[in-house]
A protein has these predicted regions:
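Sec-dependent signal peptide recognition
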Residues: 2-10
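Surface-exposed amphipathic alpha-helical segments
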Residues: 144-168, 191, 197, 301-335
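Secretory pathway targeting signatures of secreted, lumenal, and periplasmic proteins
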Residues: 30-38, 53-58, 65, 69-73, ...
Length: 335
């Protein structure tokens, strides 16, 4: 086993550990948790306080999936993208505790039991683009109290890594530059289009472009108007529900789990809506996201809509990928 070279109590310090040049492995939306069977329930309760985002498809689907493995398998799993080890108490007959003590060393381990240093987090500990976390406390109550209101900050570290890795995956190779350049030349806007996406429909008279991808079925459309007042907060929800009937004709958005959020200074969008779409003519549906973005260069309002149909399968990762694609929209001044 590998003894940790650096230690970082998450409050307020985060250590950047230099180790191997090999890339981390595993899905970016999965948390690989090494814990004993008796502590699995506690691990889930703790992690759900941090990773509490859910999309409705319409069934609830957690954005981050929690997977468990035995602590004895650490050597095989140490390059996982998001690796978590949980230990309660100091009984080294417990696999999670034995592993934690080995990695931290006796002195640092005892600090997690007798002091307030219950959470250790490092970057790139055993692989590039890895987040590695050790959670150790004498009991469940102190473990839960150790978060101290820092849940959003902790989650942001995982979100930043997710976005970075997914952008590399989506946009590094085989982008459809010809289509991107054509959109910019014709309409003075474009987005980054990964390999596998095809243009389904383009209507210059209606200011509408529709892209699609199979396996699973995903649809992505962009519509725009020269009507800045469309972003009036009093009418924005109505515009969301009018959009699919106006553009697609055969689908509608449902009120079930509908959410409307206003963007802030850190958001690329002005408004974001999420919820469930359904077909009017056949038993088909799934989650949707819809974004409003104001083009200040040309005084245009853009509506960007992402849909997926993937019955019985996980959809959250695909929805997040389409949001990353949406966020790449850019404009140039119309001559």
């Amino acid at each position: 086993m590998d003894q940790l070279k650096y230690y970082a109590i998450i409050f307020p310090l985060l250590i950047y550990s230099c180790d191997t040049n090999r890339q981390s492995i595993g899905a970016d939306n999965e948390l690989m948790v090494l814990a004993s069977d008796k502590h699995k329930g506690i691990a889930v309760s703790f992690l759900q306080k941090i990773f509490n985002d859910t999309i409705f498809t319409p069934q609830p689907e957690p954005v981050y999936k929690i997977k468990f493995a035995k602590p004895e398998n650490f050597s095989k799993l140490k390059r996982q993208s998001n690796l978590v080890i949980l230990s309660l108490g100091n009984d080294i007959r417990n696999g999670g505790t034995k592993l934690t003590r080995h990695l931290l060393g006796k002195k640092k381990f005892l600090e997690t039991i007798f002091n307030d240093n219950h959470i250790t987090l490092s970057k790139n500990q055993f692989a590039k683009n890895q987040l590695f976390m050790i959670i150790s406390a004498p009991d469940e109550q102190l473990l839960m109290e150790s978060l101290g209101g820092q849940e959003n900050w902790m989650k942001s570290l995982f979100e930043e890594k997710y976005d970075r890795r997914q952008r590399t995956y989506l946009f590094r190779d085989a982008r459809q530059n010809d289509v991107e350049n054509s959109l910019m030349d014709r309409y003075s806007w474009n987005i980054k289009i990964p390999w596998g996406w095809e243009k389904i429909k383009e209507n210059p008279d209606s200011n509408f472009v529709w892209l699609g991808k199979e396996f699973p079925y995903q649809w992505f459309c962009v519509s725009w108007k020269e009507q800045p007042n469309i972003l009036d907060s009093s009418s924005i929800a109505d515009k969301v529900f009018e959009f699919p009937l106006e553009i697609f004709k055969t689908i509608q958005f449902d009120n079930y789990k509908f959410r409307l959020l206003s963007g802030d200074d850190s958001s690329w969008y002005d408004w974001k809506a999420t919820g469930i779409w359904e077909s009017i003519v056949e038993p088909k549906g799934g989650p949707f996201s819809l974004f409003f973005k104001f083009d200040e260069l040309n005084q245009r309002v853009f509506i960007i809509n992402a849909l997926i149909h993937y019955p019985g399968k996980d959809k959250s990762n695909y929805m997040r990928q389409m949001e990353l694609i949406s966020s790449t929209i850019k404009f140039k001044k119309i001559n």
